[in-house]
């Protein structure tokens, strides 16, 4: 059977390469790649049995936890399209997102049941609802919600979903901070190349073979990645998919607590930490300054994306954590990574990240035509190649 650069296929290559390796950790819970495969297959079959069809939209309304990774993989295995739902949205924003995305199914944490109950009467196309228990007691049965693990238990564990396409759509909703959220539509192959590890970020060269990441996983011990931002953030989706494709281990936590971050790094021997600028870096610095007995020697990379990351905070982190590397990246839901700066102890500070100029960079005039070098015509910088297909 022909295999394309499809997200589900890429994850399955790693699952086959390292089935007994730990895929995801949250608190005291963890799943191996084989266990993740079993549960994701069951979820995919449950969704299909409930009438979810190829390219249907399935909302994911959860904080970072193991079930969110099961759901992400299960949704793409079913051929459906994931809709990232911001758990901070109020009912008006939820109503807009449910309607705008044409969502037909929803996976949500129980703590959001009251909001969901108030929105569903206006969004009757949302017909299948799975609820992840989180210790809260809101009533979800009033609108036909079914407990997550009970629902998927009856689903088949088999991987029998047929041929997939690189042209399948991955939908990445913007945060909606400057207006209504927009669903950025990426082909699976394109977002893999731009955000999910299909391009070497250092050289700009494509990963040549779809099995390369899985082969490397089998040949090397896993890196432990800890993305702090919520999964509604494209950066954490990126970090999680990259880890899954390459057989690495992802550590998640439902809430941000700076002291708990360092404790988690100590406990799980985290190698790569992902966060969003000063909003997270300042509390992390403050927690370190207070002092602790944590062994942080496993940590070698701290990566910030999509938010202001002040030079003074970078320098303080390097002072507290010498011999580490810090990266600061810019980008968006529409572009992926736009540029990265690297800071390390003993090196000259190069300032913030700058847009990378390479073979995918063009200048467009006011009519959208590509400007020829040396013509003297002014325009705007744009990116070509692996880009979204629209909103």
State where each predicted segment sits.
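Adenylate-forming
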Residues: 63, 108-117, 135, 229, ...
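Flexible, low-complexity linker/hinge segments
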Residues: 1-5, 137-168
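Conserved AMP-binding/adenylate-forming
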Residues: 36, 248, 266, 289, ...
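Structural core segment of the AMP-binding/adenylate-forming
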Residues: 49-50, 77-150
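Conserved pre-ATP/AMP-binding loop-to-beta segment of ANL
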Residues: 19, 155-173, 180, 215-224
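Conserved AMP-binding/adenylate-forming core of the ANL superfamily
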Residues: 3, 12, 20-65, 69-73, ...
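Conserved AMP-binding A3 loop
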Residues: 32-34, 169-205
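Conserved AMP-binding/adenylation subdomain of ANL enzymes
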Residues: 192-228, 232-272, 287
């Amino acid at each position: 059977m022909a295999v394309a650069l499809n997200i589900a296929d890429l994850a399955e290559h790693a699952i086959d390469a390292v089935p007994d390796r730990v895929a995801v950790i949250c608190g005291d819970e963890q799943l191996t790649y084989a266990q993740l495969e079993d549960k994701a297959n069951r979820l995919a079959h449950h969704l299909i049995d409930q009438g979810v069809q190829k390219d249907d939209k399935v909302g994911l309304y959860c904080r970072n936890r193991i079930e969110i990774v099961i759901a992400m993989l299960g949704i793409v295995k079913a051929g459906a399209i994931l809709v990232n739902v911001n758990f901070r949205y109020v009912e008006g924003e939820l109503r807009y997102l449910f309607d705008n995305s044409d969502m037909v199914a929803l996976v949500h944490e129980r703590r959001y049941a009251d909001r969901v109950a108030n929105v569903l009467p206006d969004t009757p196309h949302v017909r299948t609802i799975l609820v992840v228990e989180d210790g809260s007691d809101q009533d979800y049965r009033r609108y036909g919600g079914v407990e997550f693990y009970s629902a998927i238990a009856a689903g088949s564990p088999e991987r029998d979903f047929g041929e997939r396409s690189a042209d399948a759509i991955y939908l990445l909703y913007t945060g909606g901070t400057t207006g209504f959220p927009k669903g950025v539509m990426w082909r699976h192959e394109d977002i893999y190349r731009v955000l999910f590890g299909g391009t070497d970020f250092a050289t700009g060269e494509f990963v040549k073979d779809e099995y390369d990441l899985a082969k490397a996983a089998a040949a090397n011990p896993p890196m432990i990645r800890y993305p702090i931002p919520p999964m509604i953030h494209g950066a954490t989706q990126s970090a999680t998919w990259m880890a899954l494709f390459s057989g690495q281990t992802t550590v998640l936590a439902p809430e941000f607590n700076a002291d708990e971050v360092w404790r988690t790094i100590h406990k799980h021997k985290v190698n790569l930490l992902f966060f969003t600028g000063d909003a997270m870096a300042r509390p992390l610095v403050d927690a370190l300054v207070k002092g602790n007995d944590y062994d942080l020697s496993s940590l070698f990379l701290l990566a910030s994306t999509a938010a202001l990351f002040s030079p003074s905070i970078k320098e303080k982190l390097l002072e507290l954590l010498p011999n580490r590397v810090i990266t600061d990246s810019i980008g968006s839901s529409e572009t992926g990574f736009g540029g990265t700066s690297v800071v390390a102890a003993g090196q000259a500070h190069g300032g913030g990240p700058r847009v990378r100029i390479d073979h995918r960079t063009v200048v467009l005039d006011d009519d959208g035509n590509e400007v020829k070098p040396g013509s003297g015509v002014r325009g705007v910088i744009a990116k070509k190649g692996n880009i979204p297909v629209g909103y």
